Amino acid sequence: MTLNSSHTDAGGLSHSIAVYTGSFDPVTLGHLHIIERASKLFDTLVVGIGINADKKSLFNPEERIELVQTISNHLPNVRVQTFDGLAVDFVRSLGAGVMVRGIRPLTDIAGEFTMMMANRQLDADIETVFLMADERFAHVSSSLLKQIAALSENDDHLAKFVPRPIIPSLRAKLAAPSV
């Protein structure tokens, strides 16, 4: 059986639908690389943008949807939507049987393993698939991007970490007085 076969488990969840969750604030080249790779493994990939009211975000939910759609519009099997609450509940609500997680440095593994085990206790029918980050992007984080954008006006610097279509929006947000 290949990953993109239309297998449905006993719980009614489809293993041809996968969900990649994150804050995507902002979306990075590392995120895009995981999206592209996961879209080849599954018939449908839903990019779930988590909304956490307690966390200060650079981009609002609608802007994050638009940015992720912009960089993934070449992938016909990718959908983008927001969710709040537990990711595992969101995955089940879509009838998906797989959560995709990107792993950056080895330090990510401990946290992701803990989350995977908790998700398994909450819903044993949902599998987690880990995709290792490309070494070019393994060190990229939102904090790093914001620091580079704040300290350098050179868009070529930013383009090493974020898709070029994101740069104008990132620059505008960081230039706004409220940020």
From Swiss-Prot:
Catalytic activity as recorded in UniProt: (R)-4'-phosphopantetheine + ATP + H(+) = 3'-dephospho-CoA + diphosphate
Q: List the disulfide bonds.
A: none
CC per GO annotation: cytoplasm
Record keywords: ATP-binding, Coenzyme A biosynthesis, Cytoplasm, Magnesium, Nucleotide-binding, Nucleotidyltransferase, Transferase
Q: In which pathway does it act?
A: Cofactor biosynthesis; coenzyme A biosynthesis; CoA from (R)-pantothenate: step 4/5
- Give the principal location in a single coarse category: cytoplasm
Q: Where is this site: Transition state stabilizer?
A: H31
Per its UniProt entry, what is the enzyme's top EC class, as one word? transferase
**HAMAP family this protein is in?**
PPAT_bact
The job of this chain, per UniProt, is described as: Reversibly transfers an adenylyl group from ATP to 4'-phosphopantetheine, yielding dephospho-CoA (dPCoA) and pyrophosphate.
Its name, as the record gives it, is: Phosphopantetheine adenylyltransferase
